[in-house]
Design a protein with these regions (language model features):
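Active-site glycine-rich loop that binds ribose-phosphate moieties when present
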Residues: 144, 168-171, 185, 192-196, ...
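Cofactor-binding loop segments of dinucleotide-utilizing enzymes, especially the Rossmann-like FAD-
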Residues: 82, 164, 188-190, 228, ...
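Catalytic cores of soluble, metal-dependent hydrolases
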Residues: 35, 41-78, 91-92, 96-160, ...
Length: 357
């Protein structure tokens, strides 16, 4: 009896250790359990787990049901969650964004039918989990995020971040700067996020790009902000951005038109400069994305959001984020579903992605 128990315990820990070394790849074999079937050599690229291998109601909720790995080593790109909302000024809940975005990503498939992008044909991509932020301390969380992104970037991996509130853009940009120097920025948002302080605090979700300019992280003449709108305290709210050289595209300029011509201008403006894309879900109209902390009416449409991201194809993208998804304010998961799709679209425009004929 005791011997059987010891054998079972040994088998459990042996299997747990073995699972850490599993490599994944697509397969048409449906008779063998997927975790065995997908063990391959080191040259095999990871693939999302398909609906014919595991029902979409099953499996572990990673982004696109990709493998979860412990670090960015050996990856070309990674999905990483930052479950943080200590910097919010209105409705909290963005800390649950990464988890819900992963859950709603279950229907995403590897091939982009519209653009013909096939990111998993050429890039090694995985979900590396979440940054272990400190839910009791904003400044400690910022430091932790910087450390984690330094570790990601040292491997040459491009992070696609699932937020989390927009405060996280600052520590990410600091790490990006240490790796790439000053970068260009495409910033989609209802708000400029260039407040000097919020309730006396220098670091919050409304201040990251003011700090980024002050710290010399951005090329001001290569920054484009799209979708800004709503009420403010003074005209200076947006004028400060223009004084730094930013191209400010208010939402009213986007109404009832394609944004493809705008993205032609953005690509010309940025050229081959390394660029970071920061996409706040509240840039999109709350009719499509109600689950966010600071909604503003009359925003961008979903097709316009796709035009912006797809229009970034060909740029030297070094990282991107999708932030401010707050699931508690959207019981149907629509906002997180949109966020998951936009994160996938960001993956599809990274350098090195192949396109099938």
């Amino acid at each position: 009896m005791k011997i059987d128990v010891y054998v079972d315990i040994f088998a459990f820990f042996f299997a747990a250790g073995a699972r850490k070394t599993v490599r994944y790849a697509a397969s048409n074999d449906t008779a063998t359990p997927h975790w065995k079937r997908r063990k391959m050599n080191d040259h095999t690229r990871f693939q999302p787990l398909g609906g014919n291998e595991m029902p979409r109601c099953g499996g572990i909720a990673t982004m696109m049901r990709l493998p979860h790995v412990q670090s960015a080593e050996g990856l070309d790109a990674c999905f990483v969650g930052v479950p943080f909302d200590l910097g919010t000024s209105n409705r909290t809940g963005a800390r649950f964004g990464p988890r819900q975005i992963r859950t709603e990503s279950v229907l995403l498939r590897p091939y982009n039918m519209a653009t013909r992008a096939a990111p998993f044909d050429s890039l090694q991509v995985a979900d590396i989990g979440d940054v272990a932020i400190n839910p009791y301390n904003l400044h400690d969380s910022i430091a932790r995020i910087e450390v984690e992104y330094d570790a990601i970037l040292k491997h040459g991996c491009k992070p696609i971040t699932l937020g989390g509130d927009h405060t996280i853009a600052l520590p990410i940009l600091r790490a990006i700067h240490r790796k790439h120097g000053k970068v260009a920025l495409i910033h989609v948002d209802a708000h400029a996020d260039v407040n000097d302080t919020m309730m006396g605090e220098k670091i919050a979700h409304g201040t990251p790009f003011r700090r980024a300019v002050e710290e010399g992280l951005l090329h001001g003449d290569k920054v484009t902000q799209i979708g800004l709108r709503g009420t403010g305290y003074a005209a200076e709210d947006f004028d400060w951005c223009r004084e730094q050289g930013f191209r400010v595209v208010q939402a009213e300029e986007c109404w009832n038109k394609s944004l493809a011509p705008l993205m032609d201008e953005v690509r010309e403006r940025i050229g081959d400069t390394p660029v970071y894309i920061s996409f706040d879900i509240d840039g999109i109209d709350p009719a499509y994305a109600p689950g966010t902390g600071t909604p503003e009416i009359a925003g961008l449409t979903v097709p316009q959001a796709l035009e912006i991201i797809r229009g970034a194809k060909g740029l030297n993208i070094v990282g991107c984020d999708l932030v401010e998804v707050a699931p508690p304010y959207d019981p149907f998961g629509t906002t997180a579903l949109l966020g998951a799709n936009l994160a996938y679209e960001l993956l599809c425009v990274l350098p090195g992605v192949t396109y099938r004929d």
